[in-house]
Design a protein with these regions (language model features):
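Core segments of cupin and vicinal oxygen chelate
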Residues: 16-19, 25-62
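Vicinal oxygen chelate
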Residues: 20-29, 70-98, 113-118, 123
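Short, small/polar residue-rich loop motifs at catalytic or cofactor-binding pockets
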Residues: 48, 110-112
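Residue-level "edge-of-site" marker
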Residues: 51-52, 108, 135
Length: 135
């Protein structure tokens, strides 16, 4: 099995490389409602310099309005963004107490636990926890 360090050191010879995912664009039709949800409901850390950015660890959720860029609003559906948490059942209970509704029950894949829900704009998110420790 390859380690993370093997993957980090791999580089195609003589080519520019993609270094990492810099942010996830969170489409919204109501930026203030989204900021409140990601900050107050999910507990993401707001950026002190950019009101449209919320942080989960090293990942930035960039709240944006596609319609202001001449694009149609389309919620992220069918491939929920996984949010790692220490205990899916406990976090689900916390979010349900704040009014978040989940799609079905929490499920066990044999590798991890997952519970799927959506933000107020319909963008699908997932609470996630793998059994194996992260390297």
């Amino acid at each position: 099995m390859r380690s993370h360090s093997d993957r980090d050191s791999w580089q195609p010879h003589g080519m520019a490389v993609i270094e990492r995912l810099d942010f996830l664009g969170v489409p919204t039709q109501d930026p203030e409602r989204s900021r409140v949800f990601y900050r107050d409901v999910l507990g993401l850390r707001p950026d002190e310099h950019a009101e449209w950015e919320q942080w989960a660890g090293d990942t930035c959720f960039g709240i944006w309005e596609p319609e202001k860029q001449g694009m149609p609003f389309v919620a992220q559906k069918g491939n929920p963004w996984p949010l790692r948490c220490d205990d899916v059942a406990e976090m689900r209970a916390v979010l349900e107490a704040k009014g978040v509704q989940f799609f079905g029950e929490t499920f066990d894949t044999g590798v991890c636990h997952m519970a799927i829900f959506a933000d107020p704009d319909g963008n699908e998110l997932m609470l996630h926890r793998r059994y194996a420790p992260y390297e």
